[in-house]
Curated annotation (Swiss-Prot):
It is found in: Cell inner membrane. CDD domains: 5TM_YidC_Alb3, EcYidC-like_peri. It comes from Burkholderia ambifaria (strain ATCC BAA-244 / DSM 16087 / CCUG 44356 / LMG 19182 / AMMD) (Burkholderia cepacia (strain AMMD)). The chain crosses the membrane at residues 7-24, 362-382, 436-456, 475-495, 510-530. One of its GO terms (molecular function) is membrane insertase activity. It is a multi-pass membrane protein. The keyword Cell membrane applies. Keywords: Cell inner membrane, Cell membrane, Chaperone, Membrane, Protein transport, Transmembrane, Transmembrane helix, Transport. This is Membrane protein insertase YidC. The gene is yidC.
Length: 554
């Protein structure tokens, strides 16, 4: 097989994987490894679903500073922060707009590991991330108005209590009063958000409810040297999962589905996401835009059928705010598991994570699950590795003869190439025979890299001794040092490149990679260390026991 054919095989294989993956995602195929989510029944109460998508534009949604009211000469009331606590959340609701202004996720430790916390929603001088709602279509209550807590009582989920409800009432504006109720359920990262619209005026009203996520472009908990997606995302049955880059919003060039009666909108970051999930069947417009030099929003606008005087309408929605755990996400809403983004290797990464999860269920430790999965993958690919290492061993055996031929014919490149080709033919050696078996394995190992990088299950997960968190770098750099040593050993087992420059590069590569791996999450470095050690063992066994060839004089 010559180099052209090898390159063609590589291009064909990678293209096939990418095309099939895109086809899978564009058609919203359910996971082969997890249960499919069930659709939520369409809205039926109070005409909340509306009759058609509103024609208003995203610019009509109030865009005053996130969570802050525009200046007025005589503010009607002073906003307050209402603190609450559940088994999975600590948070604050700002009475200005009844906005979910702070939300800290809690992960209980097991006694050996401490509790883990991450603040998802926040509104400080250095970071803004909010979930808010309001009404459009008139001078109706929105996120700039100060609400009043209704029936103020306990704000903590205690004892045998299964749910915590917090309600907030708006001032009357345009003949409309809004009562917003948050329902927090024990053990759940899904928050029920009910918007009750009362027409207390003398004329019918046709408001539109907006639900949006607002945040800046500040990345949090992103590993050094590793890029993960940060920004809005939209899911609809028509276009399926669409990521929106902040840079596209900067240029007003974002391309996404603008109207639907299904799906959700989200803000995605490393390990965690939030998503507004309106009722299925309720028509809505979808918008995403930049509203400040470093502030963005994504949301939906859901029209409400006409409400007669003295009548009311309920608009129910769900707000997910939590970790990107695949099994949980699959059960919440169709396509929500896609916020855990594996990129173009999704088709391979999802089964790998499924297998990793099964192994973890057996051994009870994510570190050992990584080790065992790596061993299993190496065992599956052993025949391909054997073919590659045999070819490399043969090349190593004839390297002295190749160098002698290059020295003999260095002044005549044509004769040198002819002599080398004759040597390959005589010894039945393909100089590129070790490439294709390795290339075929590359997508699998890249996929496993993304599985370990994207899986929130690694966060706070210990392995042994000094490794207390597989999502953080090795505190004593022991694994990166082992990684560097294994790379040096592996390099020494390979044939020495005839080109002195290439030879120096091969010696320098372990150093360069080791510098990066010093800052990689420990789980990723563990995978590479185990993979390298197994590769060294395989290569040693094959070259010494199976691929031995007697040296022949030049």
């Amino acid at each position: 097989m010559d180099i052209k054919r090898t390159v063609l095989w590589v291009i064909f294989f990678m293209s096939a994987v990418m095309l099939y993956d895109n086809w899978q995602r564009s058609h919203g195929r359910p996971s082969m490894f997890f249960p499919s989510a069930t659709q939520t029944a369409p809205a039926a109460a109070g005409g909340a679903s509306g009759t058609g998508a509103t024609t208003t534009t995203a610019g009509e949604v109030p865009a005053a500073a996130a969570g802050t009211a525009p200046s007025t000469t005589a503010p009607a009331a002073q906003a307050q922060l209402v603190k609450f606590s559940t088994d999975v959340y600590d948070g604050e609701i700002d009475t200005r707009g009844g906005t979910l202004a702070k939300l800290t996720l809690k992960k209980q430790g097991d006694g050996k590991q401490p509790d883990l916390y991450i603040t998802l929603f926040d509104h400080t001088a250095g970071h803004t991330y909010l979930a808010r709602t309001g009404l459009l279509g008139g001078d109706f209550p929105n996120h700039n108005d100060v609400y009043t807590q209704v029936n103020a009582g306990p704000t903590s989920l205690t004892g045998d209590q299964n749910a915590l409800k917090l309600s907030f009432e708006s001032p009357v504006k345009g003949g409309v009063k809004v009562v917003k109720t948050y329902t927090f359920t024990r053990g759940s990262y899904v928050i029920g958000v009910d918007t009750k619209i009362d027409n207390v005026g003398t004329a019918p009203v046709t408001p539109t409810v907006y639900m949006e996520l607002v945040r800046d472009n500040t990345a949090v908990e992103t590993p050094m040297f590793s890029h993960t997606f940060l920004g809005p995302a939209v899911y609809t049955d028509a276009k399926h999962f669409q990521k929106i880059d902040f840079s596209d919003l900067d240029k007003n060039k974002a391309n996404f589905e603008k109207a639907a009666d299904n799906g959700w909108v989200a803000m995605v970051q490393h390990y965690f996401a939030s998503a507004w999930i309106p009722q299925q069947g309720a028509k809505r417009d979808i918008y995403a835009e930049k509203i400040d030099p470093a502030l963005y929003r994504v949301g939906v606008k859901q029209p409400v059928a006409a409400i007669a005087p003295g009548q009311s309408a309920d608009v129910q929605a769900r707000l997910f705010a939590g970790p990107e755990e695949e099994r949980m996400l699959e059960g919440i809403a169709p396509g929500l598991e896609l916020v855990k983004d594996y990129g173009w290797v999704t088709i391979i990464a999802k089964p790998l994570f499924w297998l990793l999860e099964k192994i973890h269920g057996f051994v009870g430790n994510w570190g050992w699950a990584i080790v065992l999965l790596t061993v299993l993958i190496k065992a599956v690919f052993f025949p391909l590795s054997a073919a590659s290492y045999k070819s490399m061993a043969r090349m190593k055996e004839i390297t002295p003869r190749m160098q002698a031929l290059r020295e003999r014919f260095k002044s005549d490149p044509q004769k040198m190439n002819s002599a080398l080709m004759e040597l390959y033919k005589t010894e039945k050696v393909n100089p590129f025979g070790g490439c294709l078996p390795v290339v075929i394995q590359i997508p699998v190992f890249i996929s496993l890299y993304w599985v370990l990088l994207a899986s929130v299950e690694m966060r706070g997960a210990p392995w042994i001794l000094w490794i207390h968190d597989l999502s953080q770098r090795d505190p004593f750099f022991i694994l990166p040092v082992l990684m560097a040593v294994s790379m040096f050993v592996q390099t020494s087992l390979n044939p020495t490149p005839p080109d002195p420059v290439q030879a120096k590069m091969m010696k320098f590569m372990p150093i360069a990679f080791s510098v990066m791996f010093f800052f990689f999450p420990a789980g990723l470095v563990l995978y590479y260390v185990v993979n390298n050690v197994l590769s060294i063992a395989q290569q040693y066994y094959i070259t010494r026991k199976l691929g031995g060839v007697k040296k022949k004089p030049a």
